[in-house]
Design a protein with these regions (language model features):
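Helix-helix packing/entry segments at the starts of transmembrane helices
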Residues: 93, 131, 150-156, 223-247, ...
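Juxtamembrane helix-loop-helix junctions in multi-pass membrane proteins
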Residues: 69-99, 140, 146-152, 219-245
Length: 363
């Protein structure tokens, strides 16, 4: 599933959800199949084949950079959006604009939404856990904490994911490396919050909301993995349905807890539009294009760039203060998250009829 800010998380990779947070793990897509003609045609010698390979490499790296920027700036867009609209209104606009983008693509590709009531029911739960709830919590959190801190809290999703997957997914057993990563990651959280200072200067309510949003993502991923894994519908159809359901949920709740805005301030409105159309809609297409081209392992590395970009954007464009422990803690969190997502390489046993080469022996 992909979240709005998403970045991938290997601990629980279900069928995809609608766009975000940088910590969600996309379900591995099949690499586009090689046709018979492709297989029968050798690569052109000389500069032609090399140029094509370099162009493809540049293409996915450019999309990777754009995806990192979009998701990194999502926290800035949230902060700016809440300066003109209530948090629930920001979230409603976000999922609505994101759903519109995906629906347009769905119509262009002539795909259909799922028809099964069971699928819609499970997607309604996924929409709440992966979109409506975490998006709202992040929006509320940024009323009292800087966007930099929200972006860093988002990077804790892989840590929560490892803890929950051990409990909920019997096939996902912890290793020493992953347990060490979990401990390192939470040490990073304490560093960001300045625990040795008694959390002085930190709004604990806002921080708890941001951490709660990050916790909601792996809960949603695990739910989808247990209920919708193997669904026959395309990622685009499933994600479009999920965002439509999230928009419907928020359309019911938002009027109950907010009053209609007296105006439509331009800058916050543009921020909400960018947050939805780019960070929740267009980013979905980029993410799954990357997964299809370079695989989920490389695509999920975007996770580690999002908090860096979120921090840089908040400091440079919103003039947010940055104490020394914030970037240090962020680096510790990312190191821990990387360890929790690591997998040992499978041992290779040489064929009994093959004498290992010296290079293989050195490895």
């Amino acid at each position: 599933m992909s979240t709005a800010t998403g970045a991938p998380n290997a601990s629980a990779a279900p069928a995809p959800s609608a766009a975000p947070a940088p910590s969600a793990a996309p379900a591995p897509l099949s690499t586009p199949a090689t046709t018979a003609a492709d297989a029968a045609t050798p690569a052109s010698p000389g500069t032609g084949g090399g140029f094509a390979r370099r162009s493809r490499a540049l293409g996915w790296r450019l999309r990777f950079a754009v995806l990192s920027l979009i998701w990194g700036f999502s926290f800035l867009f949230i902060k700016v959006g809440t300066q003109g609209f209530a948090p629930l209104q920001v979230t409603l606009g976000r999922v609505t604009f994101g759903a519109l983008v995906l629906m347009v693509i769905l119509l262009v590709k002539r795909e259909r939404l799922p028809r099964s009531a069971r699928t819609w029911g499970h997607l309604a739960v996924a929409a709440f856990l992966l979109n409506a709830l975490p998006f709202s919590l992040f929006a509320y959190s940024e009323l009292t904490i800087p966007s930099t801190l929200a972006g860093i809290c988002n990077a804790t999703s892989p840590l929560w994911g490892m803890v929950l997957s051990v409990v909920a997914l019997s096939e996902d057993r912890p290793t020493r490396r992953r347990v060490a990563g979990l401990g390192i990651g939470f040490l990073g959280v304490l560093t960001v919050l300045g625990a040795w200072q008694g959390f002085a200067g930190t709004d604990l309510t806002g921080t708890a909301m941001a951490l709660g949003a990050s916790l909601s993502y792996p809960i949603g991923w695990i739910y989808v993995r247990r209920t919708l894994a193997g669904a026959s519908h395309s990622h685009l159809a499933m994600s479009s349905t999920q965002l439509l359901l999230a928009a419907a949920q928020l359309a019911v709740v938002t009027p109950l807890f907010t009053t209609a805005p007296t105006g439509l301030p331009l800058v916050p409105l543009l921020a909400v539009f960018a947050l939805g159309a780019l960070g929740t809609g267009f980013a979905f297409l980029l993410q799954y294009g990357l997964v299809a081209e370079v695989g989920p392992t490389t695509a999920q590395m975007v996770t580690y760039f999002v908090p860096v970009i979120a921090t840089a954007a908040g400091v440079a464009l919103l003039d947010e203060n940055l104490s020394w422990n914030t970037p240090l803690g962020a680096l510790i969190i990312l190191a821990g998250a990387a360890l929790t997502q690591s997998r040992p390489r499978p041992a290779t046993t040489p064929s009994p009829t093959t004498i290992p080469s010296s290079a293989a022996q050195r490895r």
